[in-house]
Amino acid sequence: LLDGAGVPYVLTEAETVCGGITKNTTAKITIQHGLIYDKLLRRFGIGRAGQYLCAQKAALQKYRELCSGMDCDFEEKDAYVYALEEQRKLEQELSAMERLGFHGDFVEHLPLPFPVAGAVRVHNQAQFHPLKFVCCLAKGLHIYEHTPVRELIGTTAVTDSGKVAAKAVIVATHFPFLNKHGSYFLKLYQHRSYVIALENAPDVDGMYVDEAQEGMSFRNARDLLLVGGGGHRTGKRGGAWRELREFARRYYPGATEKYQWATQDCMSLDGVPYIGPYSSSTSNLYVATGFNKWGMTSSMVSAMLLSDLVQGKTNPFAEVFSPSRTVLRPQLVVNGFEAAVGLLAPTTKRCPHMGCALKWNSQEHTWDCPCHGSRFTKKGKCIDNPATGDLTSC
């Protein structure tokens, strides 16, 4: 978007573009982020809830425009959020959507292999192949891979090969790496999710997610069925691939597992991303983080919002996503407790980010930080931030 506006820019990437979280997404492009609109109305009122919905609609439309003519497997699909037991939650969500001027349907039966209480359906959403999309999008852009930013001095980025001076800086590093501004180490935690790709499984003709955070998700990718689930807070125990494989054996006994992968998401305190000025004490420094597992529309919203802000323009969605908004939620207490436990735990292996005790992840054979989500290989190499360095001993 900055390129199209004629704004000079440089994008620096520590590794390779889309080599991290993006390559492991299930790439659902939808305004339907769980049962979110009833929660937003209760927390923020109709004004900011409406901003959130309009931002997601704008993001979906921008994808339609950009993907037109691209070979990126873009398909329009209906999206469903289902509940296993509480139909009342679905009714409340439909009512909230109607108040915001958006229509959804209640669906009683789904092409899933287990009974549900029902689902909220939204028509004409989309799915695609994010790597194919970025490969098309990145052609001709000013991108410098294998160029990690080691330090920010004002709006000058310091890299191993030199400095980049700019009028504005956008920090889009998944988990923000500057600790002294914005308190993101308290305002975020990370959550791991797992996916298996099944061959010889049915076409479910849509995108499905459980309203419960630890529930299952489904979508097809050509001749494969992608089943997601087994999630847990990073550094804690969860079902992971074991849970997914048990599910597949029970419900899709004729299917064959072709692939497996995992991803990690930054979770905000109130379910809304932090997009905008990094903090009230920093100027010309911006951030995009806390996408809460909905990175496709959230990243596009970030692109539209931040490209406006760095050009000095106003944006109609800025208020609801403001990183400086009040976020006094129960999760803040949980995050603080986890940090205290991690700092006080008697162990020799500690995260170089802020010193929390690391936990061994036996399913993925990694050292994981339960405080902020950094992860390391068995030999100590950093594979997930916010830590920026390897373990000194393993």
Predicted regions mapped to residue ranges:
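Glycine-rich FAD pyrophosphate-binding loop
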Residues: 4-24
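Glycine-rich active-site loop/strand segments that organize a redox cofactor
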Residues: 20, 24-55
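Flavin (FAD/FMN) cofactor-binding and adjacent substrate-gating region
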Residues: 35-42, 61-136
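C-terminal catalytic lobe of FAD-dependent flavoproteins
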Residues: 124, 212, 241-246, 252-335, ...
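Flavin-dependent oxidoreductases
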Residues: 152-220
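Rieske [2Fe-2S] iron-sulfur-binding domain
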Residues: 196, 346-394
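Conserved FAD/dinucleotide-binding core of flavoprotein oxidoreductases
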Residues: 221-257
